[in-house]
Design a protein with these regions (language model features):
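Autoinhibitory propeptides
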Residues: 1-105, 111-128
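Structured alpha-helical segments in the cores of large, soluble enzyme domains
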Residues: 236-243
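Subtilisin-like serine protease catalytic core
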Residues: 94-235
Length: 243
């Protein structure tokens, strides 16, 4: 199996570890694993589960087993400009400050984004999304320095938006809706002079990581119920490195 396949396979456990442990694994035959670094101190080892004991803090240590993260809020959010006004955002967006996020990049690590929506476009219809890394799509090229998922550039997204069916060219989708809602609240464009929609920073560029779902063995370990979204700590760490 390739390292990409091991990263994705439920037959391989993901362990957050340092380079010393990775070197020890390399010197142990016949351990079946891959290791890829996240920063100067830590990385992720993907080891065949059948060659190691079941998940336990006693054996692996607390920090090695990825924590799982869920969503704080689900369901449709109705736009209400009064809520935005209470934060003070509209006041600083208007003169004399005119602070709308120009020159800033906002990054979102979540369930993805519905990139085709008007709230993520400029007035000319082009995308405000400068990069989108979808960890769940494996038939494209991952970002430079990463081993899984597919990266879509602004140019690719803009080409897709010029077609009748954008998802044929950029098939990334936010089926949950949580990531789209968070990005729109923070960075949604001003539509109809703010009557239809207005985000807190409507002129920022946007970068997005769509997290892949947690592996089943970790869901079982943490007793996460079926159907409840859950995402792995190491995938979040990779997303932070990307952004």
């Amino acid at each position: 199996m390739t390292c990409r396949e091991k990263i994705l396979s439920n037959d391989y456990a993901d362990l957050i570890t340092d380079y010393v442990v990775a070197e020890e694994l390399s010197g142990t035959s016949p351990i079946d694993f891959c290791f890829h670094g996240i920063d100067d101190g830590y990385g992720v080892a993907n080891v065949r589960r059948s060659m190691f004991p079941p998940m336990s803090i006693g054996y692996y240590g607390y920090s090695a087993i990825p924590v799982l993260y869920g969503l704080m809020q689900t369901g449709e959010i109705v736009f209400d400009p009064e809520n935005l006004a209470q934060t003070g955002s509209i006041r600083v967006q208007n003169p004399p400050l005119s602070l709308q996020g120009a020159g800033v990049v906002l990054g979102f690590i979540d369930t993805g984004i519905r990139y085709e929506l008007d709230v993520f476009r400029r007035e000319d219809g082009s995308s405000r999304i400068m990069a989108l890394w979808d960890q769940t799509i494996q038939d494209g090229e991952p970002p430079d320095g990463f081993l899984y998922g597919t990266e879509y550039t602004r140019a690719q997204i803009d080409r897709a938006l010029q077609t009748e069916e954008p998802t044929l060219l950029v098939p990334s989708a936010d089926t949950n809706g949580h990531g789209t809602q968070m990005a729109s609240v923070a960075a949604g464009s001003i539509l109809d002079q703010g009557l239809t929609f207005r985000g807190a920073a409507p002129q920022t560029d946007i970068a997005v990581v769509k997290l892949k779902p947690a592996k089943q063995y970790l869901r079982d370990y943490y007793l996460v119920a079926d159907g409840v979204p859950a995402y792995q700590e190491n995938d979040v760490m990779e997303a932070v490195r990307y952004l």
